Amino acid sequence: MRIEEDLKLGFKDVLIRPKRSTLKSRSDVELERQFTFKHSGQSWSGVPIIAANMDTVGTFSMASALASFDILTAVHKHYSVEEWQAFINNSSADVLKHVMVSTGTSDADFEKTKQILDLNPALNFVCIDVANGYSEHFVQFVAKAREAWPTKTICAGNVVTGEMCEELILSGADIVKVGIGPGSVCTTRVKTGVGYPQLSAVIECADAAHGLGGMIVSDGGCTTPGDVAKAFGGGADFVMLGGMLAGHEESGGRIVEENGEKFMLFYGMSSESAMKRHVGCVAEYRAAEGKTVKLPLRGPVENTARDILGGLRSACTYVGASRLKELTKRTTFIRVQEQENRIFNNL
């Protein structure tokens, strides 16, 4: 046993210090990034935000809607090959370039993903997703995927520390997914006692990944557009959002009615709801590590997407970053004990 005594920080522990700016307007800020990935060699340009691969967020409808904002969607792994074929038949090449194909690590997952990728060469992203990216089996699967799909851009996770981030990149991942327990419907930290404050995880993993020519995506912990800006400021190349994109017309959650008001169900992918839906039950040897919540319907996702992108542009103007690419080097975090004046929050 050992104790690390240096301070670890989440998004709520900091604010970004404003700096002198020469920008005249938020409209002057360029949010598009251009990347060339380490292993695949593929080049990509777009807004580096990703809708999470949850079946109540990462839907085909979400992918179609967010593509118009140049935002990626990690489509959840529970669609069949036939459903993928129908989606591809009805989608433009521009939509498909904003899609990530998600997979687990079983042999069946591998074969299904292979079939999906064979449907259309425009599918260039693979998202290999498990709750615990520290297992040897996971690293081996990433290496297997890299060998099988040498020109596909592979995103793999989740981890929260530099040494594991490096191992995944050396095994073939182009992008490492960072985050254990910060999600809005994740209960891993209270069920297991395991986790890592998200901002510190991003800072540590970004440093490790960039040293090897890899990239990271901050996955979880964002509740406001300001948190998205903090993740980018901390060094994230991409930011993945779940709860902030849930409850919309495109989110795919089941709608329930209570006292005449309609709500949409949103649940974590290790929750009892998810396991009952996709596996049939919660296995005897495990506990659910997610929860289910009812969200008021939030309408089309386009309004939320504009709000997020608007907040991100504004953050850049406050620190004098004319491009999102510059936000990290223009960011100075200050530790705080308050984020906002909450006097009217309950009205």
Swiss-Prot record:
Q: Where does the chain bind K(+)? A: G181, G183
| InterPro entries found in the cross-reference section | Aldolase_TIM, GMP_reductase, GMPR, IMP_DH/GMP_Rdtase_CS, IMP_DH_GMPRt
Record's GO cellular component, any one? cytosol
Q: What is its EC number?
A: 1.7.1.7
Please name the Gene3D superfamilies in this protein's record. Answer: Aldolase class I
Which terms in the Gene Ontology molecular function aspect does this entry carry? GMP reductase activity; metal ion binding
Q: Which catalysed reactions does the entry list for this protein?
A: IMP + NH4(+) + NADP(+) = GMP + NADPH + 2 H(+)
UniProt keywords (A-Z) are: Metal-binding, NADP, Oxidoreductase, Potassium
Query: What residues form the catalytic site here?
Result: C186 (thioimidate intermediate)
Its BP terms in the Gene Ontology are: purine nucleotide metabolic process
Answer whether the UniProt record assigns the keyword Zinc to this protein.
no
* Pfam families for this protein: IMPDH
Residue numbers binding NADP(+): 108-131, 216-239
Q: Does the keyword Oxidoreductase apply?
A: yes
Q: What does this protein do?
A: Catalyzes the irreversible NADPH-dependent deamination of GMP to IMP. It functions in the conversion of nucleobase, nucleoside and nucleotide derivatives of G to A nucleotides, and in maintaining the intracellular balance of A and G nucleotides.
Checking NCBIfam families in the record gives: GMP_reduct_1, PRK05096.1
Family per UniProt?
Belongs to the IMPDH/GMPR family. GuaC type 1 subfamily.
Q: How does it assemble?
A: Homotetramer.
Query: How is this protein named in the record?
Result: GMP reductase
Q: What is the lineage of its organism?
A: Bacteria, Pseudomonadati, Pseudomonadota, Gammaproteobacteria, Enterobacterales
Q: Which gene encodes it?
A: guaC
